[in-house]
Amino acid sequence: MQRPIAARGARLTAAFRHAWRRALAWLLRGAALVAVWEALWVIAWGATSGVVGAQTKAAPFEDTLAQRVQACTTCHGPQGRAGPDAYYPRLAGKPAHYLYKQLMDFRDGRRHYPLMTGLLAPLTDEYLFEIAQHFSALDLPHAPPAVPARRSGATAQQLARGQRLAKEGDASRQLPACTACHGALLTGVAPDVPGLLGLSPDYINAQLGGWRLGLRLGAAPDCMALVAKRLGPDDVAAVSAWLSSQRVLGIEASMKPAPGVAPEVSAILARDHADLACAKARAPGQGAAAAPTEAPTEISSKEPSKMLPLVARGAYLAQAGHCAGCHTPRGAEPYAGGGAIDTPFGKVYASNLTPDTIHGLGNWTRDDFWQALHHGRSKNGRLLSPAFPYTNYTLVSREDSDALFAFFQSLPPKPVPTPAHELRWPFGAQWALRAWRALYFKPGTYEAATNKSAEWNRGAYLVQGLGHCNACHAPRNALGASQGGGALAGGLIPMQNWFAPALTSVHDAGVSRWAIGDIVALLKTGLSPQASVSGPMAEVVRGSTQHLNPADLQAMAVYLKDLPTAPSLATHTVQTAPTAPSASNPQGAKIYKQQCAQCHGEQGLGVARAYPALAGNRAVTLTSTVNLVQTVLHGGFAPATGANPRPFGMPPYQLALSDSDVAAVITHIRGSWGNQASRVTALEVSQNRNQTMR
């Protein structure tokens, strides 16, 4: 009797498998869709915990947006997922404007998550919008409820309370229903209201807590902050338990508002926020707004063609000097200052350069500005902190100083006060600054080298003066002064835990053996056949050098190529007989195959203009491993530039890999494919992990 039953069961199982495969093939018909799905699944679920599950074989490289944004899907996955430090919500199918705003808020510091801020820092508004549209358009199957009701631990009374608040609100406490803004099915309303289903209770609790405490901010009027502050702890627990236990029914119906919003709730919204978008747009029976179709544009004060010639020249010089890098904090008013700059001696705050008469340069003259730039003195004669690089700007000509001042005077005045510096005694005292200047500063002007070409001298003027390259690419002493005069011998950037490699060493970042065109390409786009930029240099390329005209880029390249060769601060060391990496470091080889080979290749050859080669890469074999560890831990994108507007991203592995994992994979890379550099220890990784990246 057992055999016939077993045989029949086998036939039924085979029939079920056949039917399931046919259904799946029909659902995923088309090679392109299958490839995208598999790529998302492998990428997303292959890098989450410790040494992650093995990938089988690297897929062929395809230049798609899905490939470019692997830095996103590696953490978020196709469905959202729990991570070691948080819950990463599903991105697929969310309203495009909502996703775009969140990306902007992370990049500009309005939402606080350092990994996201660092990852998005080099990207433009336009690219963020394109990324948002990409994920919004994905129609992937929804996962089961994050926490089914039967396993949530919530009582029936709690779930009923959560359902009532979500669907009806509480007019007596001026609490609108969640459906009033988030749609009848609570799956979002186009163009900018997210869904609330398919999320974990921890994530929902964290977001409501962020709204309550002011850690998460919205554009005025901030309706979510108002709602969150009216919810008690029991309300939050009930709502999160009920929402997280609900199944998502589909995207198609999600972009519609609730069929009927209670009149008293509409009255609450209208009374508390008369201009609140959700109070107006969620009226009963009203259709959803259309999804966005056009990308935003970066905001600038004026087009250069509409400026007076002197002002236009000043705007160009401000970009050459990357003034916005300090004087325009992320998400703040252009050149209005107020941002903190960390130094080994405390915080200094960038000043307001707009013509505001109280907080800015409104009462300054061009002579006052020249005094600050050339002599390091404020309008009232006070000595300025050398965190403002007047030690470089003293080389700027009076004509260029006047042009810069004309540009800053043309800006709209912004009444943004500059906080007082927070320096440890005695570093902010005037007598201490006088002593420092006596040792390390002498006002001067750029003196052209008579034995060099005009092009070389123009490059030297830009690199040594406005570009203030040695502010990063030179070592500093215990008092913060750059060492070696104008030499660009490399050094650790204070408080940023990035190493600016020597521009005078062919083993570090020297370009004496490069073609001029390749140097120009690196400064213009962040990419060249030999290298790509990352970290602070990515921000310099995005905010400064990509905007320089061809003649100035050529001049800088000529000067940099001609720099005298000198020993690097991080002396390049070589192992004469490295052990075979796969035999001596199986852990590193395994992690590389699982996490890195898909993009960088089994032999470390990379993909041109997408993923840098690791074989023979000087950044890999530097004795200072700071940058390499930072890159593995924090990931990142190359800078988005006019010539490379959609750069490829690398996912952060700070949460996915332990210190020993990171040390093992970096050691493998530094000892493979002809690379011969020292091992990296877990202690080195741990020390870098605990430092501030940006």
Stretches with model-predicted labels:
Residues 81, 140, 196, 437-448, ...:
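His/Cys-centered metal/cofactor-coordination and adjacent catalytic loops
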Residues 56-81, 149-187, 307-328, 333-342, ...:
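Sequence/structural segment immediately N-terminal to covalent heme-attachment motifs in c-type
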Residues 93-95, 102, 198-200:
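Extracellular/lumenal glycan-associated surfaces
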Residues 83-90, 105-152, 189-195, 212-246, ...:
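Axial heme c-ligation environment in periplasmic c-type cytochrome domains
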Residues 1-60, 104, 108-111, 248-313, ...:
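N-terminal export/targeting leaders of redox proteins
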Residues 57-60, 136-166, 250-287, 298-300, ...:
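Intrinsic disorder/low-complexity detector
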Residues 218, 226, 340-348, 423-460, ...:
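Primarily the internal scaffold of c-type cytochrome electron-transfer domains
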Residues 400-404:
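Hydrophobic or amphipathic alpha-helical targeting/insertion segments
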